[in-house]
Each structure stands twice: as structure tokens, then as C-alpha cells.
């Protein structure tokens, strides 16, 4: 025992009082003399310290632990020997042990899962340093509070060992009990070799205890626990805690952790952390506590919704009905709302085991929706067992809802609500398909859609608002549909019926400030979209959830009158109406003597008009071929009317299908559909002479493909094109603002070593605006490799940006390459 007020480690730390003791040593409250800061001082038992090789092993593990920097792992401040004692000095964590927190009973899943995820991430951090904890239990976890909420911390590495220790360092050889019997892995229980998956088993026992309030085995003696961990089947978690029975994915995850065979458990703490994050997102649509689903007003119950909260994948952060109407909440866990809140969980199994499903369309209570969970009638929510096989994707997420929907449903009859929703769906749902979007969930008035292309998402939103505008002109004001359309792009986990990830939180914040009739999107969408398709203007900013950072918002510019976006997406009508203003402009142009008179005399002859247009550079040569099926198909594709273009091509005669223009239109259509193998197959069928006249739309599409696919595949596809034309076109694209086609054009020119006509510093600086971390990393690395001091401002911008938030933590998006290059370039200039 150390006496109070004694000094250790050359007087750097003062002992204040004992805190406790264990099998490996005593722990004292101490003070760092130089700073007056509280610390925890762990002193190894003298008899252990005297064991051969223990002092060296202690130093080695302390050195490794000191390199672990993670908010869920207690920080090592110092270590060394003081007289006959080996001391480990750690930060002093104020809070409550998980053991004490669990004394009253199990922890609600909504509180438990974020803490467990933090612990899994901390465990991953120590595993990455080559350390196995070996003694995970509630007593070794502390819960502290901060301005950002609760933080779980891993403590006590007294019997941790290196993942690959030498034989002489094995703790088992010096007679120390390895771990706590209640939480031992089967490998530890039988004295077999352990690896990091042993900690995952112990983590499973801890999780079982947290969620159910009891252990998976009854014991009660240490030898009983050893035997049960080694060979007995654990009590199923849903039997230990029946209120968790609807959480199928979470149950599966916990029981996987308790597998005797380590190969059947999650294979890393990183995988476990991802599964817990997915479980939290999926489960947070439920109320915390005993897992009661959020209140679902039944048709005819008389309950009046008042909040209209749309929830995709997570629950509202507040159960109060005083929040803004029509908001989409994606973060936190919704407390049980009052009967008047109208918060409904759709597709969640009822307590009787039957699926609740979506409420009937006729119900006025369908305005509030919870997205991201499937019915438990046979299919698990996306958590635990299968979450780890869903790969992150960079997608554009769209959220739409009717402004004032909740108030409106409360004053309308069931029949009126049914008609309103039917009209809403008929107007908007076809547009999702036409723009290659995928409807993930539809709940009442709210749609959750994902697009692979930000441009397609923006164009779909514009088409929606135009179609709604036309509808609203034909009905009384009280019956108009005023819809908000919000878009954000980022890395998500997208399953057939849910979208999980930070972009869901961001789009919630966007929806809070968006206005009906607008298409509102974030800077991530604005940077990635094709800006030639639509003009946008800034419309304020939002604060990113959980961060003190501002995110700029944009909205598509509306027309001064008529349809907000010019009705360019109308599915009916022809291009004939567009011909009138073009001819009027032609009449106003002063033509050379004779030609003007000729045009006035023969203006109704399409071929001659087309000839005049070509001479004027007006870009309307298609007038001479307005009956050509291929030309009409291209016109529809350029207007974003993919389905109509496909219908026209399918209806073409056999003779028309052999037209070069229609064959090329088929290439462009396959690109628009995202069918890239079919696109390249159709391209390979084009004759050499057809490639001479290939439309820019096809070249643009191939450049876009080049922005996201392997270089060699597309290099072969483009090898047949006339090199001079391809190079000239792609040089123009490479000088544009960032888009996938800009990036693809730049990659192609570099690949074929034909980029000498491009300002590479400017082009790669543009690519730094990509929302894709991998593209920004490649661009930063290339800028660094150019060795041009002109690139310093762009690379300084990279280093000033926050790192991207990935599913496994922060991601380096070229920060290190840029910082190294800046240092090197500045040294050269000096």
C-alpha cells in the first residue's frame, strides 16, 4: 500500500487516497504535481512485479496503451517504476461505473446502443494496437457525462496482453486468474489460445447483461460459469427479456457474439461497431424503455395528430408536440408521445406479434411516418446479423412531404384524405421512376427516394414541382398540394427498405427550413450535379447535426411566372411549341443578301430552314429531321424524358431501328438507365462512320462513366472514337466545374497521355469540390505530384476542411497528401 501524500515516478505524481484494489494491484486517486490535475494511479502487486519478465512486459503494454487515443478508452498519462512498484498513471474519469448503472435493472435499448457502439469503437482502437483486453465487464466500464451527452469509457487493462505475445510473457504461467468467470470467453474458460474475438464474446455477455439485466448463464459458482461458457447453450435473449422480442436484428447480433465457435462471431470490433450503429438507427423508431412501439393512432380512434413528424430510420429527438410540423427526425430516440402527437411507427410488429403495416390511405393519421424498419413478420430489421454485409454507397437522398399535412388531415374526412394521398401519389410516383430514382419508403405524405446521380435527383424534384403547379391551377386553393422537396448527397447504408447514415440527419435539418414549391438541396448536391441542367441560388445555411459547422443550402431558380421550372419535364405535348420562338428569332436575324429573302420565301420547308440555322450557328439542325425517330429520341433524352424516349425507340419500325441516329440514341438511353454493359454493347455495334458523328450526349455519358469505373474498361470502349474529336471534347469537359463527367474526362486524358492542353492544376483543383472522399484523395495526390506552387491554395483548402465522417470514423480525404505537398513546395520556393 502507498501512503497518502507519497510521491511516485520521480515526484511527478502525488498519491491522495486509495480507490480500490483487484487481482493485479491497487488503484489510487492521485494528482499530477505540475498541473494539479487529478489522475488515477494503478500500482502492480509487488509479487507480480517480481515475476521474471513481468517488468518488461508491463512497460511494453503500457507503451502500447499510451498510443491509443480514443474517447472510449481511458488515456494513459505516464508509466514507470517507483522503488519496488510498477505504476501506471491514467486520466481520472469522473462518472458512474456501468455496474452501478445496471444495479436497478436493464438499460433501455435507446440509451444502451449508443454507449455500446462507443465501447465497440474503443475496443477496435485497442485491438488495432495489438492488444486484447481480456477482462470486459461492467465494473471496467465508466459512464461519464459531457456537453454532448453520455460517453462510455473502457478502464482497467490490468490483464490485457499483446495479440502476439511471446511464450514467456503469458500471464497464465504466473498463476493469475485470467478474467472474470461470468464474462470469460469459451477459449479463456478452457485455457486455449485467444485472439481479439475472445473480447467480442465477453462484449456479448456484457451486452446481454445491459439489455436484460441478467447473465446468459446461471452459474452460480466460478467453476459453473467456466463450464457453461465452454459447453452450455446460453439462454436466448428474448426469453431473458421478452420485451426485446420484436428487435429481431439486435437479438441475432447478441446471440452471434455468444457463439462458442469464434469464426461464427463478428470478426472484428469494427464490424461490431457498424452493426450496433445500424441497430441503433433501426431501433430508434421505437420508444425507449421496454421497447413499446411509438403510438399508432388507429382509424376511428379519434386521436388527432398534431406534430406530423416523418421519421426515416430513427426516432424523433423529442416527444413534445410543440415541435415544428412536418419535420423529418432522424436522430435520437423518440420518447413515448402523447396520444395527440400522431407519431406512428409503420411496418413494425405489434406486441401480439402481428405486423402493424402501414395505416390505410384513408386514415387521417398517416401523415406521421417512421421509416427504416420492416415488419417483424418474418423479416428482420437491418441490424446485427446482416448489417455488416451492406456496403456504404455515395447516393443522393430525396425527402418530400406536404406542408401543413397534419393540420389538413385533422379537418378533412377519411375519404378526402384518401383522395388527397391518391392524387399526390399519382402525380409524383411516376416521376421517381422516370428519373431513375428508387423509392425506398412511402409513408402517408412522405417519400424517401435515393438516386445514384445528384443531377437526376434535382431534375426529378423540378419535375415534381412543375407537375404539382399544373395540378394546383385546376383546384381550389384549399385543395392544393404544397410539397417540400429536399436533397442531400453522402455515404449511406441503403437496404431495400431503409437508408441509414449521417445524410439522414442532414436531410432532416434541411427539411426543417425548406419551403413548399421549392427544390432545396445541400452544397454536396450542388457541387456534384451538372449545373448546366438547372440554375440554382443560395438560400441560407443550416448547422450540421452534432457539429458547430454551417452547411450552405441552394434552391433551383424559379421562373417569374407560369410553371416554376418552365414545364420542361411535361410528359405530354411535342417540340412543336418550341419551334415558334426559334423561328421568330430566325426572322429577326439579319441574313446576307438573298439568303434572308430565300428564308422568308421558303421558311416552311424544313430542310432549307435547317440549312439557314446551321449557317447561323443556332444549333437547330434537327428541324430538317424532325420526323427522324432517332433525332426525336435524342430530343426526349435531352429533356430528361427517358421513358418516352424508350417507348419511341421500342415502337420504331425495323427499318427505323437500323437508322444510325436511333442506334446512337439507344447508347444514350442505356447510359441514362445506368445499364452500362448494355450501353457499351450498343456502342460496339456502331459502325466506324457512325462514330464520326456521335452526339455530344454520348461522349458526355462515357465521360461520366469514366468518373466512376475502371480506366482500362472504358479505355477500350473509347479506343474506336476519332481521337482528335474525343480529345477536343474532353479538354472542354475537363475545364468545367466539377462533375463526374469533368472528373471522367480528366482521368481519360491523363490515361491516354493527352492532357497537355489542360490546365491540370485548375482541373484537379475543381475535382477537390467532389463530395466523394476517394475522388478528393486522388485529386489531392495528383496535385501534390504535379509539384506546381500554383496548387498550394487548393491544397491549403483541402487541409482546412474537416475530415469526412465514414461508417468507421473519420476518413482522410487527401489531407495528409496535401499537407506533405504544401510543406515540400514551400521548402522549394524558399
Curated annotation (Swiss-Prot):
Q: Which residues form the Guanylate cyclase domain?
A: 396-511
Please give the residue ranges for the topological domain Periplasmic.
624-830
Residues annotated as the enzyme's active site? 135 (proton acceptor)
One GO biological process term is: cyclic nucleotide biosynthetic process
**Where in the cell?**
Cell membrane
What main location does UniProt list?
membrane
Q: Which residues bind ATP?
A: 19-27, 42
EC class name: transferase
What exactly does this protein do? Regulates the activity of endogenous beta-lactamase or related enzymes, by blocking their secretion by phosphorylation, in response to an external signal yet to be identified.
Q: What is this protein called?
A: Serine/threonine-protein kinase pkn2
- Organism in which the protein naturally occurs: Myxococcus xanthus
